[in-house]
């Protein structure tokens, strides 16, 4: 059973992208990967609808790249493995566009899309504004061989 709003990656795995500033949608995931600042994490976890399911956080400032790129790659790979195994997974940042779109593009790479085509794939299949900055686009192009935030 998939999550409402989930998209299908080229390898058949399903993932839901969303914005944490929006109300939590219907459908409880088995696992969530959340992208944001420590402040955002505190705010989300203080809400009535805070994630009660297994989840991880990546410190990833808005319009930027992850603070610990190698750790982010490990968590993105783990998210993909869970999705391939049939778990209901989601990825989310504040608005659900730039950082979330960047991770969805990285998931597309893991699902077989050439890294040079992954941003276009995410914009076609997830959100037309996915991957908002030039450095996010470069990060996807180098994924999963990313060793730095720059």
Give residue ranges: language-model regions.
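Cys-dependent protein tyrosine phosphatase-like superfamily
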Residues: 1-90, 103-150
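Short cysteine clusters
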Residues: 93
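Ser/Thr-glycine-rich phosphate-binding loops at phosphate-binding pockets of nucleotides
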Residues: 100
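Conserved G/P- and acidic residue-centered "switch" motifs that form tight phosphate/ATP-binding loops
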Residues: 96
């Amino acid at each position: 059973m998939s999550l409402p709003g989930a998209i299908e990656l080229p390898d058949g795995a399903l993932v839901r992208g969303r914005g944490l500033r929006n109300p939590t949608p219907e459908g409880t995931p088995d696992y969530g990967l959340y992208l944001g600042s420590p402040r955002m994490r505190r705010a989300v976890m203080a809400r009535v609808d805070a994630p009660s399911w297994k989840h991880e956080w990546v410190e990833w400032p808005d319009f930027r790249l992850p603070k610990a790129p190698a750790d982010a790659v490990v968590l993105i790979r783990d998210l993909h493995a869970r999705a391939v195994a049939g778990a209901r997974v989601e990825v989310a940042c504040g608005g659900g566009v730039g950082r979330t779109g960047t991770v969805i593009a990285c998931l597309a790479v893991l699902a077989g899309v050439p890294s040079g085509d992954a941003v276009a794939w995410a914009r076609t299949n997830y959100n037309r504004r996915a991957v908002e900055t030039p450095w996010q686009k470069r990060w996807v192009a180098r994924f999963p061989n990313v060793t730095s935030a720059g």
